[in-house]
Design a protein with these regions (language model features):
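An active-site-proximal structural segment forming one wall of the substrate-binding cleft
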Residues: 1-15
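Basic- and aromatic-lined ligand-binding clefts that recognize polyanionic substrates
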Residues: 12-45
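Histidine-acidic metal/acid-base catalytic patches
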Residues: 6, 32-54, 58-142
Length: 142
């Protein structure tokens, strides 16, 4: 796996492109399941073109202790996805304390993309308004 990813990174790196590896929680049979495993693979590839996609929803399901695990793998994280657990909806609809996570990302100086990979907990306009309210709430840590 590492050798194949190195070959891919060799193609991407001269162009400043980055591939991201995403550990998932949908099945225990999946190859990538933890942030530590993905971190070690990225370290083995040893290229700025091979990084971690840290999906907060999947990592909460697989390992919890989100801030600690983000810190352990920080230097390899290139992209972060958002989704609450359970339900994979907007922040504030599940158990994840997104206000603390957003505060931590801010304090770490994270300037990357935060992908909203989740559904809405309510349908239609009501759901869109709930989504906006949720993001305002979790972004209000200052």
């Amino acid at each position: 796996v590492i050798e194949a990813l190195r070959r891919g990174a060799d193609i991407l790196e001269p162009h400043g492109l980055v591939m991201v590896l995403e550990p998932l929680s949908d099945s225990p049979d999946l190859y990538l399941r933890t942030s530590a495993q993905t971190y070690m693979i990225c370290k083995g590839v040893d290229s700025p073109s091979c990084k971690i996609l840290y999906d907060i929803y999947h990592m909460q399901k697989n390992e919890g202790n989100l801030i600690h695990n983000m810190d352990l793998t920080w230097e390899e994280i290139a992209y972060i996805q958002i989704g609450d657990n359970p339900g994979r909806n907007e922040p504030t609809t599940g158990e994840i304390n997104y206000k603390n996570i957003f505060k931590h990302l801010y304090e770490k100086g994270y300037k990357g993309v935060l992908g909203m990979e989740h559904g809405n907990s309510k349908p239609g306009k009501e759901g869109e308004l709930a989504l906006i309210k949720a993001y305002k709430e979790v972004d209000g840590f200052m």
